Structure formats: C-alpha cells, structure tokens
C-alpha cells in the first residue's frame, strides 16, 4: 500500500491537522554570527534523536493518514538571504517532510525558523525541539560535537497517553455553558465555508509586545491580587473584545488551550506526546461596570471547578471541531492559548536571543481570530492569527488595558 515503512496511523486527534495540512512555526531572532555548517550538523543530530520528524504523511484508501518513513535523506537546512528584497515562502508539503528548518540571514539579526507538522507536535513540543536544536548548535560551535544522540520513539497520540493515565471521555464537554446563547440573539451570519488551498499558506498574524517593565508590572499585579497571569490576560482580551464588538448585551464564549503535561500523573515529557492539550471554556457576561480583577477571579474559579470535575482532562479526547470556528447560532468565539514562558535558551557567547514569534501555516483560510501568547526575553507577546478585520485595533485595546491596570490598582514602579 505504502512505498515506505509505516511507522503508525494517525490518531483521531492528529488526523484533523493532516486534513488541513497544518504546520506550526517558531522563529528565534538571534543577534550575532551564525555558522551555517554548525547549524546544519545540529539539525542532522536533532533528526537522528527524533527520527519520526524525518518521515512524511501518506493518505490511505480510507482517507486517513499514516506516518511513513522516508527512503531518502532529509533535505536538511534551508538558507535564505534575508537582505534580498523578496524571498519565497518555504515550501511545506506533508507528503515530503514533517519538519523544515530555515535560516534567514539579515543585516542586524538572523532568523532561525522551525516548521513542524501539527499532527506530531503542539507548541510545547515544538519549543522543546527548537531549544534542543540551539543547544546542539552551541555544542557544535564550542566543542565540535552536537552531543549524545539517543533516538526517541514516535510520540504517543493524546488518546493513548490519556488512556494509560486512566482518563475516560464523559458525556459533558464544557460547551454546555454556551447552550443558552444558541440562536438567542440576532447575530450577523457566520462567514461562508472556509476556502481550501492546494498547499499550506501562512495565516495572517498581527502582534504586539509589552516592554520588560510592563510585563514585570503585570506579573506583580497578578501575584499581589492572588490571580494567575493567564486569567488577567484573558480578562483583558475579553474586555477589549466586548468594547469593540458593540454588542454589550451579548455574552462572549471564550475557549482556551490547556497544556495537560503537568496536570497528569505522572507528568508528561515535552516530546512524549503529540498534542496533549485540553480545552477550557468560559462564558463572559460583561457590562460597563465589570472589574478586571473580578472577571479574572471568576475565570480562575471556573477553571478550577472544571479541572476538579475532570472536564478539561477528557476534553483532549474530543474532535478538533473548534479549529473550524464558531458553530452557527452562537456569538463569535474567542480562541486563545495560555501563556507559555520560553526558558533561557543556550547559545554561543557571541549570539543573543532577542525575540521569538510563531506562525500557523495551513491549506485553508482562517476567517476567525486566534490569540497566541508567550513570554520570551522577559517580554509578553500577544499574537492574533487569522483573516479578520482590524486586528491591530484589538491588540492596541488589549495592550492599553494591560498597561493601565497596575497603575489603576495602585501599583507604581520606579
């Protein structure tokens, strides 16, 4: 059936990403010289340590995809001169490769971009791979050797992982709290069916960054008020969306991804599973007098209750329908990740990590917004992915709320 050796069939939670040919990319902005040969050697070592990423996907007769080993060597590092006026987008093809690495050379910064198929890795997984790549690169530059290589098995599907942890699917999903909204309001029609493309295209993204001081102030505000940083950020996003939607009487459905690795016992390694991610839900009923601390506290309380009930753990067993946007009859969803903090990454002494961002690539149009939040180099970054109107207006409103909160609540930093 397949010309190469089949590693395994994709699980249900992974298949949705194959059908949309979805890749996620992380880009590290580095200042300082980059040795191309050393980066290429580090990438080769990374693929030897994680050989599944040297494979590709093939569609079976039933329409489902399989991970199939490649008979040929991986194409390796792609080097682009970013000083040229135009550069073509990297060609992503799941039938050829599940991991591409691109080095873009610039005047003041160089960009190291890792593209990984979403069927095999979520953001946490990809971040770990990029960290390992740069660590091995540092070893090659400083010692001439990329370090020990112990090949890892293919990561487990979330379904298998959760089954081994005793997690079972229940009848409840968390979306029940949105049912009172179903066809309850006069809402504009949802966009027509999403356009499909032959090959993955980069999804539009708009971004804002707080300064390191603004980020530190916000962290202090959250801690001093007994709130999680994630909840404060979620409350700011909800308040900004509520103000700009101009439908003050309509509650807002909020959905956010939850990394289950540290919520399971025993904890799950960064590269042990493909997408061990649950989905938490919250129904925001906001008015002119809604206080950000009260809203954030209610988000935390709802999350803890759903976590205690096992709702969030078992949500990873369900379909990726949320990737297709808001169902008919409901107000537009807000989709968001929890904040991920990039740990210090090893680099040679003359190389400095100065920025970090992500991008989604898939073979369909994304006519809804998806927030991705992270802290790197001590600065909060908020990305808004999707083909939506006025994304910068939303991000500016969120930033204004986040930057004004510490002073409004009495936290002044010198």
UniProtKB/Swiss-Prot annotation:
UniProt keyword annotations, A-Z: Acyltransferase, Lipid biosynthesis, Lipid metabolism, Transferase
Pfam families: PapA_C
Gene3D superfamilies reported in the protein's UniProt record: Chloramphenicol acetyltransferase-like domain (3.30.559.10), Nonribosomal peptide synthetase, condensation domain (3.30.559.30)
NCBIfam families listed in its UniProt record: PRK09294.1-4
GO MF term (any one): acyltransferase activity
Catalytic activity: 2 a mycocerosyl-[mycocerosic acid synthase] + a phthiocerol = a dimycocerosyl phthiocerol + 2 holo-[mycocerosic acid synthase]; 2 a mycocerosyl-[mycocerosic acid synthase] + a phthiodiolone = a dimycocerosyl phthiodiolone + 2 holo-[mycocerosic acid synthase]; 2 a mycocerosyl-[mycocerosic acid synthase] + a phenolphthiocerol = a dimycocerosyl phenolphthiocerol + 2 holo-[mycocerosic acid synthase]
Annotated site location: Important for mas ACP domain recognition: 304
Entry-linked SUPFAM superfamilies: CoA-dependent acyltransferases (SSF52777)
Originating gene: papA5
Positions annotated as active site in the UniProt record: 118 (proton acceptor)
GO annotation (BP), single: lipid metabolic process
Entry EC number(s): 2.3.1.282
Name the record gives this protein: Phthiocerol/phthiodiolone dimycocerosyl transferase
Family annotation (InterPro entries): CAT-like_dom_sf (IPR023213), PapA_C (IPR031641)
């Amino acid at each position: 059936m397949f010309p190469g050796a089949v590693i395994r069939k994709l699980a249900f939670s992974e298949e949705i990403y194959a059908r949309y040919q979805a890749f996620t990319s992380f880009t590290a902005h580095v200042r300082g010289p980059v040795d191309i040969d050393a980066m290429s050697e580090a990438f080769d070592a990374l693929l030897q340590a994680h050989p599944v990423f040297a494979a590709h996907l093939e569609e079976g007769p039933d329409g489902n995809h399989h991970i199939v080993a490649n008979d040929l060597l991986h194409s390796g590092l792609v080097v682009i001169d970013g000083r040229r006026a135009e550069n073509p987008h990297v060609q992503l093809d799941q039938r050829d490769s599940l991991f591409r690495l691109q080095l873009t050379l610039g005047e003041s910064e160089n960009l190291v971009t890792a593209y990984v198929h979403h069927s095999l890795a979520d953001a946490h997984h990809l971040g770990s791979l990029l960290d390992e790549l740069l660590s091995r690169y540092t070893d090659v530059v400083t010692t001439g050797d990329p370090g020990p290589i112990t090949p890892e098995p293919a990561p487990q599907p979330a379904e298998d992982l959760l089954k081994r942890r005793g997690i079972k699917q229940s009848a409840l999903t968390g979306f029940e709290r949105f049912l009172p909204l179903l066809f309850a309001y006069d809402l504009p029609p949802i966009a027509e069916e999403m356009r499909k493309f032959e090959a993955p295209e980069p999804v539009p993204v708009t971004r804002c960054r707080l300064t390191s001081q603004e980020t530190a102030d916000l962290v202090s505000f959250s801690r001093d008020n007994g709130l999680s940083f994630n909840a404060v950020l979620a409350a700011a996003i909800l308040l900004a969306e509520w103000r700009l939607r101009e439908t003050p009487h309509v509650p807002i459905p909020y959905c956010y991804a939850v990394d289950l690795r540290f919520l399971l016992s025993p904890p799950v390694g960064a590269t042990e599973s493909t997408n061990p991610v649950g989905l938490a839900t919250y129904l925001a009923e906001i008015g002119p007098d809604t206080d950000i601390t009260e809203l954030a506290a209610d988000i935390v309380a709802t999350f803890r209750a759903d976590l205690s009930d096992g709702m969030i753990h078992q949500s990873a067993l369900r379909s990726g329908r949320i990737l297709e946007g808001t169902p008919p009859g409901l107000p537009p969803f807000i989709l968001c990740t929890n904040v991920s903090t990039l740990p210090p990454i090893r680099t040679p002494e003359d190389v400095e990590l100065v920025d970090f961002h992500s991008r989604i690539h898939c073979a369909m149009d994304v006519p809804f917004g998806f927030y991705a939040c992270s802290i790197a180099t001590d600065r909060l970054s908020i990305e808004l992915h999707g083909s939506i109107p006025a994304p910068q207006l939303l991000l500016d409103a969120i930033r204004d709320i986040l930057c004004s909160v510490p002073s409004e609540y009495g936290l002044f930093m010198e």
